[in-house]
Each structure stands twice: as structure tokens, then as C-alpha cells.
Amino acid sequence: MTELHPDLRENVRLLGDLLGQSILRFPGQDCYDRIEEIRAAAKADRRQESGSGQRLVKLLGQLSDDELLPVTRAFNQFLNLANLAEQYHGIRRKQGHPSDLMVESLGEVFDRLKSGGIDPQELHRKVADLRIEFVLTAHPTEVARRTLILKYDEMSDCLSRLDHDDLMPGEREEIVDRLSLLIAEAWHTDEIRHERPTAVDEAKWGFAVIENSLWQALPKFLRSLDTSLSEATGQGLPLQVSPIRIASWMGGDRDGNPNVTHEVTREVFLLGRWMAADLYLRDIQALRAELSMWQASDELRAEVGDSREPYRQVLAQLRERLIKTREWAEASVKGEPADDSGILFENEDLTGPLELCYRSLMECGLETIANGPLLDTIRRAHTFGLPLIRLDIRQEASRHAEAVAEMVNYLGLGDYLSWSEQERQAFLVKELKGRRPLVPRNWQPSEPVREVLATCEVVAGQTPEALGSYVISMASKPSDVLNVILLLREAGMAFPMRVVPLFETLDDLKGAPDSMAALYEVDWYREYCSGRQEVMIGYSDSSKDAGQLMAAWAQYQAQEKLTEVANRYGVHLTLFHGRGGTVGRGGGPANRAILSQPPGSVNGSFRITEQGEMIRFKFGLPRLAVQSLTLYTTAVIEATLAPPPVPKDEWREVMDWLTERSLRSYREVVRENPDFVPYFRQVTPETALGKLALGSRPARRKATGGVESLRAIPWIFAWTQMRLMLPSWLGSDVALEQAAQADRLPELREMMQGWPFFRTYVDMLEMVLAKADLRIASYYEQTLVEDEHLLALGQSLRQRLQGCIERLLELKQQQTLLEQEPVFAHSMKVRNPYTDPLHYLQAELLRRDRESEGAGKVPELVERALKVTMAGISAGMRNTG
């Protein structure tokens, strides 16, 4: 087993010691001793020392209500500090540890592509045309409070400063003192949110990720891309090219979230402009100090006359307009009268003066100055624009159909919802080709329809740079897309917006290619979309609907066929991947996922959701963000120029054979076994999850109901908390078992060797199985389940999990899980003694919580400690839902 890197081990030890000092100061020695005793017992239990498990459970059982909270908080804080140390270690560039970075450089990938026969001109063209868009979403998975995240970020900065070998003893002591203070502040800060964030709060957090990290990271990354591209092809990155885009669902995603109204969306658009103006003002102030030179081109002189400081004069005018823009946005947010004269609204208002200065400096031979901070600001302006972030709108298809139906009914044209698809399309295309407004002025729509129309009006008032995609969930036919375009036109939309159908259930994925072919058959629409189309693939719901193996295969086939259909109609397709942080929701290492997409499906453009806590893990610190941007960019370029081979027909047959068995066995348990939902409710903390104020979105679509009413995120969260990890392996166990019985494992090994898609699936399954824990799952059952039928189901599921592990080891010809991932294996080994006590405590607290609820009152300390265990286990697992 690979040990932790000495530097990482030293950082974990330092942070743990400083946390211990905080605990010694408060609550004091007795509590500290109790925590140490529990930690020692948990370590002994993991070493399988005789009687240590019973001793651990006994120690935890003896905790009084008053001791519960400090003990759970101590283990939660340690796991957060361990995450922090690991996250920092991933970006450490300390001399002698180049392997720590674990990301292939842009130059290495470009060289490999050229060695493989890619022409440098083709490489340059593909990079210049690259379009990678990250869509930040606030799914309720980020457990850590923003207050603490800021403290953790500064702790990471302290670790970075400690990495300098030339520190004087006094300097080192000063940094350690600051670290000690930050850890003490974190220890005395309540780590649990007690009120749900609003949709606007979530959007502000998205803006904060840009301000604190991406604002610095993006120009740094683009400099590196420019240099590597220039070295590889002889040409740098064109000035106006922005291969990276940042979009967001925070404040725009109203699907299943009644808290996101048109007022919220309008406020988020305005807040984005306010924040952007503020950030650009800081840049312009710094540039005014830099650009003091007097040489200028005739073009610039024509703009400013004989000024001795022509650049400063241009920047002073820009500064005045940015101040006006910020004041206008602030007044508009508050609902006060706002003067919009002289504000910056279109992107050219910002990029024009900056590029004028750039051209002048280049013409005067001042390239070094032109390519300094001015270039960084221009790159930011082309990436973030004046709106700062591109806001997506998401709404369910039936809401648009109902709006059109009310309109049609009011005009006396018939019952739209009873029309056939062909009748709907004929009506919509006729209206879209015409010029007349459809909505009469005196019409009074119902409240739900009024809200849909008001949202369309807010969207129509934006510039193209402020908008991402209009995503339609539950879309299945061309009229679903045409409804939205008509409603936007009625609202006054002056330019075509991307309208994106989302396919997420198994049936949706299977029907997606035919649905898109029918849409491309509409001549008017092909002209509207100008040969470009985006389609969203949902990973979470398909996995919950069909099990992970069937979902992964359905997603792969849908992407293949969608690409074929788009090519047939001469349409450039961008696939928008609605992935989560966990394997059960399509998560996993990004570069592996991209490189295992069907050949031809990436094609220079890639759009992906970054959800909840994964935003922090990937983009939370500037150096981390540069690393993530590099990783995605190299993978997208490679998948575009050197895609994986087309899978053999016999491999497809094997996948059909496997998934037929996995789907049947998954649904037999999840859909058809009457004991399953009661078992799920009793053995997991699902019902208590509603108490965690995680996000603005309700955890359920309906107040009651089975698994289908539960959102995909709490569904995964609940199983992760008690370590059965069921959504990610159920069904695969039977498929692998029957493959072994049919002597088909050699075929599967051949597929692993030659097919990145299948290899990635098997590797992700192994990672999930390594996080599962049979003993802990069994303890939850013993503590929380009494019904014999439910206990029998639990025993059967645990036996199936054990069987899945055995079959996977046989397939990979390994003795233990994660043999080829020693760093990850050791990370889990280090975390387990800290996570185990939280699991045992959580099961006990759930029991007390349920008993107290039955008696009518849950003690506050029990409820708070229960919330802390959920947060701590999430930190230990490095993900939630």
C-alpha cells in the first residue's frame, strides 16, 4: 500500500495538531481525551484488533447529549482539514515533486497529437475554434458553509506559504500562528446552515467563485494556452478568441423550484452586471497606473487628440462608464429609479476601447506592454463579458405547452393540448414565419402562465452575452422546442437563443435521436438554429430510473445516434452533459470521462454542469482552477483530434447482454419489491435530510411517494451516508455474476483493453465499491430496522454487494480493490478512522431522532449533532449527492 506523500502527511499532522489545541482550549481536556479515546478505538477497529469494534460502539453509546456535538464536530472538522490538505497537495508545485500535479501539460498533449500525424495548422484551427463551457449549478450538494469555505481557502494559502524552503524561523512561526487562529475560528463557527439559502444567495456564491478564483485563473490559463499553442504551431491564440465560457443555473433553473421566479432571474442578471462592473473597475484602475506612455497610433490619437497620456485618457472614460454601470445596476437591484445613460451594456462597449489601446501599443512597437496586464483584461472581457456569467434558463416542457394552449384558447383557435404533434408544428411554424404578435394586449393569463411569459420578457431584455441556453426538461418532440421560441418571440426577443431539449430517463434517451431528426426536418427551425444545435443528456435521473450500467450504455448510444443524426442534417452538435459529482450521477475523473465519449461526439465543443461541492474541489482556488481548465482543455482537444476507436459489433452485443440483465435485476428491487421503499426510508437518513438547509430547491418533487418522487441528489446522498452506495452498483452485480457463469469475463477483459468507455465504467464501479462498507451498512440496519422482511432484504443487498466486489476483482484479476489506484486507496484508509465514528453516531442519532419525533419533541443537541454527522460523512466521502 502506497503511503501518503511525506509533505501531505506533514500537513495533515500539522492541521490535526492545531485542531487538537483548539479543542483543548474549549471544551477542554476531558472532551479532548474522549475524542482521542474514540479515535484510537476506531483505528484499532480498522486494524481488526479483537473487541475494538464493540469498544468503539460502547464509547460512542456512553456519550451524553452534551458531549454529542463537540465529538461529532471534531471528527467533521478533521475530515474537512484533511480534504484541504489533499486539495492543496494536488496543486503543489514544490521542487522535486512534479508528479504531484497529475495533469498532463498542454505542450505535452500538443506534441503527442503532432507525433500522431495531426497537422500544426489543423491543431491551431481546432484550438482557436474550441468551445468549452462550464455551467455552475447549485444543486443541494454543497454541505460546507460559505463562511467556512473562505477560512479553508486562507488555510490553503498558509500551507502554500509554508512550502518555501527559505523561510526564517520567525516567518514560519507567524504563518503557523495565523493557521492556528483560522482553525480556532473554524472550530468556534457553526458549520451547519440553519436557514436554506435563497436562489439569489446561491447565485451570489457562483459570482464569488469567479471573483475569488476564476478571475485570476482564467487569464493565467489562457497565457499558458497561448504559449503552448505558439510553440506547437507557430501561431498564438487570437486576441478575440475565448475557448472557455462560464455559465450558471443559479437563479435561472426553475424546473421543480418554485422559489426561482422571473423577479429572481432579473435580480441575478443585474447582480452579475454589478459584480462585473466592480471587477473591471479594479482592472482599469491598475491599468491606468501601468499605461503611462505617450507613444500612440493615429487611430488612438483620432480618439483622444494630443493628450500626453492617451491611454490613461481612454481608460479614464472607460472608468467613468463602469462607475455609472455599477450605480445603475445597484439602483436597479434595489428597485430604485436608475439612469442608464452612458452605461456599458453591449460587450463591444468594453472590448472596443481596450482593443484600441492594444492595437496602438502593438503598432508603436510596445509588444511587451501590450501583452502584459492589458491582455489579461481583454481576455477576461471576451470570456466573462459585461454580464459576468451566461445564465441558463431551465423549465419543464409542459409549462410552455400550457402557455401556448391558453393563448390559442383565448384567440378561439381550438384546444391546443388535444392537437396532434403535426397540427401543433404546423400552427407554430406558421406563427413563427409570420410577423403579427399573437398575444393581445388585454389578455389576462392564469398565474402559472403569467410567470412563464414574465420570465420570457426578462430573457428578451438581455444581450446575447448574458444568455446561455434555454433548457427544456421532459422534452420529447419538436413542438416542445418551437413552443419556447414562439414565447420568446412574443416577449420581444431580438436574436435567436439556443433552445436545448434535455433527455434524461431511459425512454427519453432511446427516443432522443428520432425526436431530434423530427426537429431538423422542420425547414424553418434548421434556418433558425444556423446549423448549430445543443442537446442535454441527463445522467442523474437515467441512473435512478435504470441503474448505473444500463444508464451509462443508454447515454453512450444516445450520444452516438444524436451525433449521426446531426451529421446527416449538416448540423454541428454540442452535447451538454448534466453530470453530478458522484458516480451514480455520472461523475468521476473528467479527462477519463471526456476521452471515453463516442468518437465524433466531442468535435471541439463540450458543455458540462459543475455541481455543488465539485465546484469548490475543481475551481475553489486559482491554481486549482488553472489545473482543472488545463485538464478539460487537453481532454476535449484530444477527444476531437484523436477520438477513441469505434467499438466492435461484438462488444455492443455484450453490452446489450449485460444491460438487459442489469436493468431487470435493478428494477426488480427498486420498482417491484414492496419492501424496498420502506427499507430505504428506515435504513438511510433520507427523511432527516430535509432538515439540512442545503439549497433553495426542495428535495422532493412531491411531498409523498416512492423513489420516483425523490430527486436524484438526495437519493444518492442517502445511500452514501450509510455506505451501501446502492445506486452505483445494483444491477451490475447480477450482470457480472452471469457473465462469470457464462464464461464471458475474457470478453469483458478484451473490452477493457480496447474500449475507453467500458474501461472507465469498470474503474468508476471499482471506486464506488471501495467506498462501500458492509459492516457500517449492517450497523445501520441493526440500529434502525426491526421488521424481519426489511432485515432480510438488507441482508440480501449486502450479499449482492459482496458478490459484486468478488466478481469485479475476478474481472480485473486483482486481490484487493484499488490495487492500481494506491493514492486513492491510502486516502480512504486515512479517512476511515475519522468517518467510522460519525457513521456509528449517525445511526444512533437517527434512532434517537425518530424516537423523539414519535414522542413529539427532538432535543436540539441531537438534531444539530445529526446534521454535523451528515456534513462530516460527506467530507469523508469527498462528495454528497
From Swiss-Prot:
Gene Ontology cellular-component annotations: cytosol
Catalytic activity: oxaloacetate + phosphate = phosphoenolpyruvate + hydrogencarbonate
EC numbers, comma separated: 4.1.1.31
GO biological process: carbon fixation; oxaloacetate metabolic process; tricarboxylic acid cycle
Active site: 139, 544
Keywords attached to this entry: Carbon dioxide fixation, Lyase, Magnesium
Biological role stated in the UniProt entry: Forms oxaloacetate, a four-carbon dicarboxylic acid source for the tricarboxylic acid cycle.
Protein name: Phosphoenolpyruvate carboxylase
Source species of the chain: Marinobacter nauticus (strain ATCC 700491 / DSM 11845 / VT8) (Marinobacter aquaeolei)
